[in-house]
A protein has these predicted regions:
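Flexible hinge/capping segments at coil-to-helix
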Residues: 166-177, 181-203
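Secondary-structure junction motif
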Residues: 158, 188, 202-223, 286-295, ...
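Central regulatory/effector-binding core of bacterial HTH transcription factors
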Residues: 101-163, 233
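Beta-alpha-beta core module
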Residues: 164-171, 175, 237-283
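Hydrophobic hinge/microswitch elements
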Residues: 139-144, 148-152, 158, 207-264
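Short helix-boundary/capping micro-motifs
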Residues: 21-40, 55
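A late-sequence structural motif
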Residues: 116, 264-307
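A short LG(V/I)-centered, amphipathic sequence patch enriched
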Residues: 51-70
């Protein structure tokens, strides 16, 4: 339980957060001073004064630089976290004043970067030219983890995290998944294939943590067999290339372009779709710029090509 002395100590430490964080980052008083734009003697005096306030040394000499003591490391780490929170707050305050000039950190799966992301961003930027985007790509699990940790504002993801109470999701489109096989494969001449036809086949798929991997595993389980995974990758184009080389078959979205000569795309029976959606943190945690983009995405149907259809998936959470 924090007592009054803790409050008083925290209040005296607060003005030195930037110095403590800079010393922790650089390991050198002079470099920390340069980073903050203050004279080195001033930084040294402030550190000495802080040590007196705390009652323990914060730094020790180490070669030509310094190293933090255990107490110093604790305070430097806390200072870094506190400054990150203040930076985020300053950004939000600035965007509250001028929502038209904010920055949106948008996460998405690799497979969605060709059509969905450019289409949705392009339409929004026409009406909001001052808003900037930082784009992050990764696996489904990586993107959802980053969303929970506040590293990104929104994520385009499939399948949607409908069971996560900390996130709100809205469907955008359903994307058909097809079996990709080399032309010489026994299934290549079929007009349709069933999931059960894949039993015993060498499958090329994405690693665990990717949405397509989960869909592949679930489809095989529903058909009553465990998939025989021959190769795992992190990029759909790598998976497609392995299929073209005759190393297995794969479940992938329809190609944006006519498939290359080394790959045949075969619809499944019944058809298999995955719902692509947008997810964001529950509650009022979005900046004005991110809220504007979310509203644009959720209210503007976009023609994304033959691989997509209007969504039939469910939504989750409260906006």
């Amino acid at each position: 339980v924090m007592d009054d002395s803790d409050d008083r100590l925290a209040a005296r430490l607060a003005p030195a957060l930037a110095l403590l964080a800079a010393v922790g980052e650089t390991g050198h008083v002079t470099r920390a001073a340069d980073l903050l734009g203050v004279p080195q003697p001033t930084a040294s005096r402030r550190l000495a004064a802080l040590a007196e306030v705390v009652g323990a040394p914060l730094v020790l000499p180490s070669g030509r630089g310094i190293r933090l003591t255990r107490t110093g490391r604790t305070l430097a780490a806390a200072s870094t976290r506190a400054l990150a929170a203040m930076t985020a707050a300053a950004r939000e305050v600035r965007e509250e004043i001028d929502p038209g000039s904010g920055r949106i950190v948008l996460g998405f799966l690799h497979l969605l970067g060709r059509t969905l992301v450019p289409s949705l961003i392009g339409g929004f930027r026409e009406r909001n030219p001052g808003i900037r985007f930082s784009l992050a790509q990764g696996s489904r699990q990586d993107m959802l983890d980053a969303l929970h940790e506040g590293e990104i504002d929104l994520v385009f993801v499939a399948p949607m995290p409908l069971g996560d109470p900390g996130l709100v999701s809205r469907p955008l489109a359903d994307q058909e998944l097809l079996l990709c096989a080399p032309p010489s494969h026994r299934l290549a001449t079929r007009t349709r294939v069933r999931a059960a036809d894949l039993e015993g086949e060498d499958l090329v798929t994405l690693e665990h943590g990717y949405g397509l991997r989960q869909i592949t595993d679930d489809l095989c389980a529903a058909a009553g067999f465990e998939p025989r995974i021959a190769f795992e990758g992190q990029e759909s184009e790598t998976v497609r290339g392995l299929v073209a080389a005759g190393l297995g078959v794969a479940l992938l979205p329809r190609s944006d372009h006519p498939p290359a000569g080394g790959v045949v795309e075969i619809p499944l029976s019944p058809p298999v779709f995955r719902t692509v959606g947008v997810s964001w943190p529950a509650g009022e945690r979005l900046t004005p710029a991110a809220r504007a983009f979310r509203d644009h995405v959720c209210s503007h149907p976009t023609d994304l090509g033959p691989a997509f259809r209007p969504p039939r998936g469910k939504r989750s959470g409260q906006a």
